[in-house]
Amino acid sequence: YDVTLAVKAGADVVVVDGMQGGTAATQDVFIEHVGIPTLPAVRMAVEALQEMDMHRKVQLVVSGGIRSGADVAKALALGADAVAIGTAALIALGDQSPEFDEDYKAIGSAAGFWDDYQQGNDPAGITTQDPELAKRLDPILGGRRLANYINVLTLELQTLARACGKSHVHNLEPEDMVALTMEAAAMAGVPLAGTSWIPGKNGV
């Protein structure tokens, strides 16, 4: 209903954020128990747009756990127009680096496990307003790392599109996907691998 309301309110872009995102800027109960996984969120948003004949007219952007070219390919195949990345970009910039492990330990965590980005005490100097911490971020090196990450993600996406016989990543479609488990098939609305069966479709 949220997508329908957004479109009726005049939105020209809808952003769907699945529960697999890396945020810690909320209560634990929200992180663990609120929201739905990203792929079914995409499917439901696309269905809502299609019902209003607004799919591809209103842009659909997907975020929440997008880390690899395969994640992007799945989102585009299900009908998204674009994706947004958050935590993966922070890590590409240099967050969670073992270089700052002692600093992470000093604030009660460890490199690779810290997720309190909202507190402003990021040892890597990325998500902070503290001038001393901010000096730790080398914007040139960080920019190169982020560019490398996005280039690799794009190459993975293009490779998967080619493997599906597509000339462009935006030509990916649900028919290019199968699921490996019944749960994934039901959530994403694609057939279970080796069958034409989509659990829950047509009441079966």
What are these language model-derived features?
Residues 1-130:
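Glycine-rich phosphate/ribose-binding loops and adjacent secondary-structure elements
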